[in-house]
Amino acid sequence: MTIKTGTRRKSRELALQMLFQMDMGKQSADHVEKTFWAERKDLEEEVRSFAIDLFHVAEKRSEEIDKLIEKHAEHWRMERMAAVDRNILRGACAEFMGFPKTPKPVVINESLEIARRFSSPESVQFINGVLDSVARELDAERKKKS
């Protein structure tokens, strides 16, 4: 089944909103998911499904993802980053790890479009640099294993 680009972007934005809510509200993933979807019953199933899957990967692999982001965000600790930027990066890294069939340039481009919508112009450049570096490392690791 092929999912349209607009559908995927909507899912990514929803996953970002859940990650942001969990991060800023210091709430459990279960609580965030339950309350978030209680208010959004009218969304298409494919939008909802991919958003939930992406959120679950980001939540389950959060420590690994945060370490990876900090490694590639030179001179930036996670807590110093803007919350929106931090969670855009988390969502993209979760997609790199949990959905390896999605081309990394697509994930990066989608993340930049989301950053243009929800963050600042400076953040777009920052996110691009971090994700490009993360993608190169993950590709190098994958090549070593094969």
From Swiss-Prot:
Cited PANTHER family: ANTITERMINATION NUSB DOMAIN-CONTAINING PROTEIN, N UTILIZATION SUBSTANCE PROTEIN B-RELATED
Keywords tagged on the record: RNA-binding, Transcription, Transcription antitermination, Transcription regulation
SUPFAM superfamilies: NusB-like (SSF48013)
Gene name per UniProt: nusB
GO biological process, one term: transcription antitermination
One Pfam short name: NusB
Entry keyword RNA-binding: yes
Function: Involved in transcription antitermination. Required for transcription of ribosomal RNA (rRNA) genes. Binds specifically to the boxA antiterminator sequence of the ribosomal RNA (rrn) operons.
Family statement: Belongs to the NusB family.
Lineage: Bacteria, Pseudomonadati, Acidobacteriota, Terriglobia, Terriglobales
Gene Ontology cellular-component annotations: cytosol
GO terms assigned for molecular function: RNA binding
Domain of life according to the entry: Bacteria
Keyword Manganese: no
UniProt source species: Koribacter versatilis (strain Ellin345)
The protein's name in its UniProt record: Transcription antitermination protein NusB
Stored InterPro entries: NusB-like_sf (IPR035926), NusB_fam (IPR011605), NusB_RsmB_TIM44 (IPR006027)
